């Protein structure tokens, strides 16, 4: 193998001499992407499957327990939060019911179920899923570690634009401003923080409202006992989270289905028994009459009506568990009509007994079914809380993958379902805050005010992100985008103006919680970005490394050194710092970059990308491990074993390509022949770059379509496998001598000339977060006896 080999990721890294790429680079690029039109169809693997009617019914039924628990338990507390001071005019009940009906129609049904749910990222929902979609279609990520080889993943899908289109102009506008990228990130973080707030408020208000039913049948019980019962249920709920929902998850759908069946039946009974005239609320005229009667109370009552659509944020965040068609079917056929009947039945009861508004749900239940209904209501409240807690865990995991949250332990609780995870630290924080809110307010009205504030802000964030999705991903006409955005903002800003009146009545709680999490998440991301920029600017020249010779000017001791770095190109500063202070290194050096991509998952066979650095006798490699935001670093993944399997595959494939590189059929082997950048054609002898996509599928895609003539070249390549086999044996021997994981133990400090707020953020907040978060060695399950930390100070 003549000449020098430059380090690269997918053949794309360019250092001082990186512009010279030879014929092997061209071959690699052919191997590293779909070979033909058929292979091109593998891109964007996610396609919603066509289901039989029976399977669709089954999935729709199962989605009730995961997706709709929170939305379904809203009848427990909506009317009391709408009329906290009592009902002064019975006609107000009709106006409030009409508002509830059209709120459920416009927001959950039309906006979320039929529009927002279609904006999923390969079936994944939530604010970070929308952000990942945007990051793939425009360069809006604040950490610029993406590479074009990432786009060849089968799960990486994107669309192209006409240069003069509205989408292309919007894309350039977003990409050309750092402040716009930061604003987009902050918008996503605000939405995420509000959903975390929901993870605190949903269990509090749902369980407290369900437990409050005790006062109806046991009047001697005071509110203090109800709060104690609610706290006991909450402690039990959070304490069993580490078991996961795999064992009891099958109960969720039947519980929620029974809940919807019962509230719909009771609703129909109350309409028939008390006041069938409430059905006139389906006319929007009564909304106009409701506000025409005037008064601030009617406007602020929108904050209570807002609670009728809570749970839509969890609906979108939990979307990954089921196909969109099942979620849509369940809502339109079961959830929507049952909720309309439940609210109409309560309204009919309140028209006759307006003084029962504080416990409207339980008061409207016939006495004979009170206790069964109380048990089902409590169970449904627990299921609703569980769904929101699980959604919070998923969002934290996504934030971790995007570098927006301190490293915390993530536990996979199910062998069957990838999305079922448990985050211990977050679980106990949620429990403490949830108990504090429940015991502190002791009243569902103030918790409801807080809940409404969080939900409406999440809705506003989703609308703004959907506007960009419609432009950049769906490429909708600007008129359609404007229509959707304006209609959504008019409704949501109306609700937002109403909840602002209740900020001092409990609405401040989610704002404080969100502000605290926002500071943590943004400071962590800012510190991570500055660390990455420092590493990029201080990486070592490739010419310097190659100039040291095969021994690197050091003593090469037996063994393998895995040098962990955040850089996907170049030689990291940690390595030069290491060999400067300790003039010895291992016989084989592998630079390991663990990289998170804006995709939901990276298939295991595409996880690792292996490259060679320098000539063969340098024994230096780079391995990029790529993960999506749903992928987990599990103990049973055996990261080190898979890394070496990919390395050995690389060496064999490299040897095979060397065998066919001098043949006259080389262009066929590489699928296509392209002029190399250094002027050497496909039949040239000088090889500047070796880069392969480390999957057996890549090899098969080269070998399978070959002719008889190709077969002879393949045999020739196999006869030259001995070179690759010798190196495999050499590396195996070094592996037996010991593998050492070399990681940077960096201390990040702000420069002396930095502004005051930057010094506070870096020297105190970021430093504190790094001190309490998990070490990288724990995330990758590195044994302590094989770990070598290299201390450094980064001045950013």
From Swiss-Prot:
InterPro entries: K+_transporter, K_trans_C, K_trans_N. It is a multi-pass membrane protein. Keywords: Cell membrane, Ion transport, Membrane, Potassium, Potassium transport, Transmembrane, Transmembrane helix, Transport. GO terms for cellular component: plasma membrane. Residues 1-58, 117-184, 239-248, 320-321, 390-420, 475-480, 527-796 are cytoplasmic. It comes from the Eukaryota. Residues 1-30 are annotated as: Disordered. GO terms for molecular function: potassium ion transmembrane transporter activity. The keyword Transmembrane applies. Residues 80-95, 206-217, 270-298, 343-368, 442-453, 502-505 are extracellular. Putative potassium transporter. This is Potassium transporter 10. It comes from Arabidopsis thaliana (Mouse-ear cress). The gene is POT10.
């Amino acid at each position: 193998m003549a000449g020098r080999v430059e380090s690269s990721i997918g053949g794309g890294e360019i250092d001082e001499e990186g512009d010279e790429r030879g014929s092997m680079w061209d071959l690699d690029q052919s191997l590293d992407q779909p070979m033909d039109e058929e292979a091109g169809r593998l891109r964007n693997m996610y396609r919603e499957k066509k289901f039989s009617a029976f399977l669709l019914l089954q999935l729709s039924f199962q989605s009730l327990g995961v997706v709709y628990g929170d939305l379904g338990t809203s009848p427990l507390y909506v009317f009391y939060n709408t009329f906290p001071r009592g009902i002064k005019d019975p006609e107000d009940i009709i106006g409030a019911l009409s508002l509830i009906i059209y709120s459920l129609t416009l927001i959950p049904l039309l906006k979320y179920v039929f529009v927002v749910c279609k904006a999923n990222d390969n079936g994944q929902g939530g604010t970070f899923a929308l952000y990942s979609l945007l990051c793939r279609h425009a360069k809006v990520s604040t950490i610029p570690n993406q590479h074009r080889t990432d786009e060849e993943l089968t799960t990486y899908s994107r669309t192209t634009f006409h240069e003069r289109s509205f989408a292309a102009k919007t894309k350039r506008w977003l990409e050309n401003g750092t402040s716009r990228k930061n604003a987009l990130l902050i918008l996503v973080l605000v939405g995420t923080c509000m959903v975390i707030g929901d993870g605190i408020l949903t269990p509090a208000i749902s369980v407290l409202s369900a437990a409050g039913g005790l006062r109806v049948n046991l009047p001697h019980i005071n509110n203090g006992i109800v709060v104690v019962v609610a706290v006991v249920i909450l402690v039990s709920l959070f304490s069993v989270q580490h078991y996961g929902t795999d064992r009891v998850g099958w109960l969720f759908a039947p519980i929620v289905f029974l809940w919807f069946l019962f509230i719909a039946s009771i609703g129909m009974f109350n309409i028939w028994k008390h006041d069938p005239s409430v059905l006139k609320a389906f006319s929007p005229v009564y909304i106009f009459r409701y506000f025409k009667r005037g008064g601030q109370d009617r406007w602020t009552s929108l904050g209570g009506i807002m609670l009728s659509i809570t749970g839509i944020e969890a609906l979108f965040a939990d979307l990954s568990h089921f196909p969109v068609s099942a979620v849509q079917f369940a809502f339109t056929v079961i959830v929507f009509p049952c909720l309309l009947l439940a609210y109409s039945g309560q309204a009919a009861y309140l028209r006759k007994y307006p003084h029962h508004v504080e416990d409207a749900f339980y008061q409207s239940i016939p006495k004979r079914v009170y206790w069964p209904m109380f048990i089902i209501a409590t169970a449904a409240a627990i299921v609703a809380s569980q769904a929101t807690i699980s959604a919070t865990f998923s969002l934290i995991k996504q934030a971790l993958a995007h570098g927006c949250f301190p490293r915390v332990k993530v536990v996979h609780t199910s062998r069957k379902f990838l999305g079922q995870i448990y985050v211990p630290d977050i679980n106990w924080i949620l429990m403490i805050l949830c108990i504090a809110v429940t015991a502190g307010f002791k009243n569902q009205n103030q918790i409801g005010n807080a809940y409404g504030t969080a939900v409406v802000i999440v809705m506003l964030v989703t609308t703004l992100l959907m506007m960009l999705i419609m432009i950049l991903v769906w490429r909708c006409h600007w008129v359609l985008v404007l229509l959707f955005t304006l209609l959504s903002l008019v409704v949501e800003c109306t609700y937002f103006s109403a909840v602002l009146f209740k900020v001092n009545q409990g609405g401040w709680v989610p704002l404080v919680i969100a502000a605290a999490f926002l500071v943590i998440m943004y400071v962590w991301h800012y510190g991570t970005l500055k660390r990455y920029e420092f590493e990029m600017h201080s990486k070592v020249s490739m010419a310097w490394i190659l100039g040291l010779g095969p021994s690197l000017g050091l003593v090469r001791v037996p063994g393998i050194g895995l040098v962990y770095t955040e850089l996907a190109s170049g030689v990291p500063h940690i390595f030069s710092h290491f060999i400067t202070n300790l003039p010895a290194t291992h016989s084989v050096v592998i630079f390991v970059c663990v990289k998170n991509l804006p995709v939901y998952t990276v298939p295991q066979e595409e996880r690792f990308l292996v490259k060679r650095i320098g000539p063969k006798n340098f024994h230096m490699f780079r391995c990029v491990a790529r993960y999506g935001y749903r992928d987990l670093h599990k103990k049973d993944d055996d990261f080190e074993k898979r890394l070496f399997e990919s390395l050995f595959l690389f060496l064999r494939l490299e040897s095979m390509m060397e065998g066919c590189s001098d043949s006259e059929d080389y262009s066929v082997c590489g699928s296509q022949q392209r002029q190399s950048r250094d002027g050497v054609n496909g039949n040239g002898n000088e090889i500047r770059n070796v880069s392969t996509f480390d999957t057996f599928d890549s090899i098969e895609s080269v070998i399978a379509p070959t002719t008889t003539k190709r077969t002879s070249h393949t045999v020739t390549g196999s006869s030259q496998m001995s070179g690759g086999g010798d190196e495999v044996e050499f590396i195996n021997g070094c592996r037996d001598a010991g593998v050492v994981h070399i990681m940077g133990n960096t201390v990040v400090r702000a420069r002396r000339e930095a502004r005051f707020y930057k010094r506070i953020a870096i020297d105190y907040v970021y430093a504190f977060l790094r001190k309490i978060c998990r070490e990288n060695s724990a995330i990758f399950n590195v044994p302590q006896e094989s770990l070598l930390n290299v201390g450094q100070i980064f001045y950013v």
